[in-house]
């Protein structure tokens, strides 16, 4: 049975709940259960990115923006954001991206390899398509890592040069929910937010009422927003 997030009341198992301090803003805490945990967790738990690492993120929606926030947190440089939508790239810059590549205007792989002199060391894919994952892999330097957090359809298949994994000592890593332990990592990330080290506010495009939920889904589908928070008192 599913648990509804679009109702005034819901029933959840105790083991699915995370207790947080009252001092945390409850509205913003809603973002930590999925996007932040997945994106930031991929950086600090799965990949354990080191300061000064050359990085890139393919797809800067809610999860991709969270990856950017995580990369800024650990001191990666440069942080290259790749997307087809200008408004998403603008948000990525606010989140901490140092360079932007609009994939609707240029070949993102060629542009990224030119910018970095052969590819980035750690390249994250947060789109959920085999095309984006293939591009992310192609934009990774020799000896580098491609980390995928997107969820493609079960029928999708990825084709990459098999020899490159050995001959170029490449790594392809999967990260599910940021390799997080929720009871450990959600309070940890919330504290980083309270300290001002994790600029989560950039993810919230707007607050909406429960009656506006369908409009919210339309805006999300059109790529107009990163995340929206439903407030029941609007």
Label each region the model flagged:
Residues 118, 122, 134-138, 179, ...:
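C-terminal hydrophobic helical "lid"/dimerization subdomain
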Residues 1-3:
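Phosphate-binding beta-alpha-beta segment of Rossmann-like dinucleotide-binding domains, i.e.
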Residues 8, 15-16, 21-106, 110:
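Mid-domain Rossmann-like dinucleotide-binding core that forms the NAD(H)/NADP(H) cofactor-binding site
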Residues 35, 129, 182-186:
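Conserved donor sugar-nucleotide recognition element shared by glycan-biosynthetic enzymes
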Residues 56, 80, 145-147, 173, ...:
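Structural detector of well-ordered beta-strand residues that form the stable sheet scaffold
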Residues 47-51, 63, 74, 84-86, ...:
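Glycine-rich cofactor phosphate-binding loops and adjacent beta1-alpha1 units
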Residues 9, 57-60, 81-82, 101, ...:
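Glycine- and other small-residue-rich loops at beta-strand/loop junctions that grip anionic moieties
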